[in-house]
Amino acid sequence: MTAALAAARAAATMASGSSGLAAARLLSRAFLLQQNGIRHCSYTTSRKHLYVDRNTKIICQGFTGKQGTFHSQQALEYGTKLVGGTTPGKGGKTHLGLPVFNTVKEAKEQTGATASVIYVPPPFAVAAIDEAIEAEVSLVVCITEGIPQQDMVRVKHKLLRQGKTRLVGPNCPGVINPGECKIGIMPGHIHKKGRVGIVSRSGTLTYEAVHQTTQVGLGQSLCVGIGGDPFNGTDFTDCLEIFLNDPATEGIILIGEIGGNAEENAAEFLKQHNSGPKAKPVVSFIAGLTAPPGRRMGHAGAIIAGGKGGAKEKIAALQSAGVVVSMSPAQLGTTMYKEFEKRKML
């Protein structure tokens, strides 16, 4: 960056008057945009950390709190390799038979953990995310709802300028590889190891899709709840890349909702990367078809603003990418089954 600024100053010196200064500004601006592009691209390299399995070692931030205790116990009973947790001031103690540490850095060094799940109240959740990023934990899953959006803008800014840590959430149910690893608050018993990758902005609709794919005998390969906030760490495109490159994932369910442009971006990604005779079947449902403009519908990000973010536009974009859009969340499982049947994949 220093070299570019020096070159810009030199250009300004050589040129006379305002035109020289304008040239310098343009040169500096171009370099900064290029640098930002490089930095932003580095975050995409962390997509690979979304894949978790029985060997993934996890710590819990907010380990000894009520929510942390309950869901850590559930994770252990599911068979997840939870290796410890953090609660500032309680380092050196044990909880649920596992060690408690004061800091994430210490917990990572002592346990070899590569993932962290955060059950910390909203006022302190961003500090917990920042601590995990600074400790270079590969995967951070933040369950907390109600984090101020201004705080998440700062977190997003930090995330986009590094490539070591992948954030899922906040305000999400988490990530699960059925039968192997459960990071989050989803009910483990409805999941069954199988062939469908599920990504969703809605927690409860994720469970609906999971239950249905289990009932029709397809099961799930990996499920990721990306959360319903406007500024989150992982979007549809990140998960789609994992699903398209995963041999165990033969079909994909994408559950979106009104607000933002994540679904449109996903449609564009699918056009580029999931076309032709070997394309994987993708089924989708978009919540909020009858939602009035300007009113937030549950999630902070579920709002139609400025005439954009409506369900009809999202459905049209997905259909143009070859996605089969279900008009009812109750038909996701049967729709996917029919797609498998049509392609002779059963």
Swiss-Prot record:
CoA binds at T64, G65, K66, Q67, K90, I143, T144, E145. Pathway: Carbohydrate metabolism; tricarboxylic acid cycle; succinate from succinyl-CoA (ligase route): step 1/1. Keywords: Acetylation, Ligase, Mitochondrion, Nucleotide-binding, Transit peptide, Tricarboxylic acid cycle. InterPro entries: Cit_synth/succinyl-CoA_lig_AS, Citrt_syn/SCS-alpha_CS, CoA-bd, CoA_lig_alpha, NAD(P)-bd_dom_sf, SUCC_ACL_C, Succinyl-CoA_synth-like. GO terms for biological process: tricarboxylic acid cycle. One of its GO terms (cellular component) is succinate-CoA ligase complex (ADP-forming). GO terms for molecular function: nucleotide binding; succinate-CoA ligase (ADP-forming) activity; succinate-CoA ligase (GDP-forming) activity. The modification N6-succinyllysine is found at K57, K66, K338. Transmembrane segments: none annotated. The modification N6-acetyllysine is found at K57, K66, K81, K105. Its EC number is 6.2.1.4, 6.2.1.5. It catalyses: succinate + ATP + CoA = succinyl-CoA + ADP + phosphate; GTP + succinate + CoA = succinyl-CoA + GDP + phosphate. It comes from the Eukaryota. Substrate binds at Y207. Residues 1-27 form a transit peptide. Succinyl-CoA synthetase functions in the citric acid cycle (TCA), coupling the hydrolysis of succinyl-CoA to the synthesis of either ATP or GTP and thus represents the only step of substrate-level phosphorylation in the TCA. The alpha subunit of the enzyme binds the substrates coenzyme A and phosphate, while succinate binding and specificity for either ATP or GTP is provided by different beta subunits. Heterodimer of an alpha and a beta subunit. Different beta subunits determine nucleotide specificity. Together with the ATP-specific beta subunit SUCLA2, forms an ADP-forming succinyl-CoA synthetase (A-SCS). Together with the GTP-specific beta subunit SUCLG2 forms a GDP-forming succinyl-CoA synthetase (G-SCS). Belongs to the succinate/malate CoA ligase alpha subunit family. This is Succinate--CoA ligase [ADP/GDP-forming] subunit alpha, mitochondrial. The gene is SUCLG1.
